[in-house]
Amino acid sequence: MVDQNPKRSGEPPVWLMFGAGGTVSAIFLPVVILIIGLLLPFGLVDAHNLITFAYSWIGKLVILVLTIFPMWCGLHRIHHGMHDLKVHVPAGGFIFYGLATIYTVWVLFAVINL
């Protein structure tokens, strides 16, 4: 018999943020490291152009994506890694996902006020 009122989990939105963070980290952060770590110091990219891009709406969106999603991924990994190591933090999900939410709100305010 199939349960007509299945218990819903709160995990799918968290897994969405975790997956997005892993994807962003793997695909886009190497490009950011290349631009900021190599091209900018060697003068191949003008700093004024980067600053102008950061102040545009698409630049703000890029900053949001490159900062928020990897943080969710990292805190999700720490939360589940501690569980795998048998270190059970009381209300661990609330703590780690709460920190990610606070960070998200903080970054949103910071980037919007650029």
UniProtKB/Swiss-Prot annotation:
Belongs to the FrdD family. The keyword Transmembrane helix applies. One of its GO terms (biological process) is fumarate metabolic process. GO terms for molecular function: succinate dehydrogenase activity. The keyword Cell membrane applies. CDD domains: QFR_TypeD_subunitD (cd00547). It is found in: Cell inner membrane. Anchors the catalytic components of the fumarate reductase complex to the cell membrane, binds quinones. This is Fumarate reductase subunit D. The chain crosses the membrane at residues 24-44, 50-70, 92-112. Keywords: Cell inner membrane, Cell membrane, Membrane, Transmembrane, Transmembrane helix. It comes from Haemophilus influenzae (strain 86-028NP). Part of an enzyme complex containing four subunits: a flavoprotein (FrdA), an iron-sulfur protein (FrdB), and two hydrophobic anchor proteins (FrdC and FrdD).
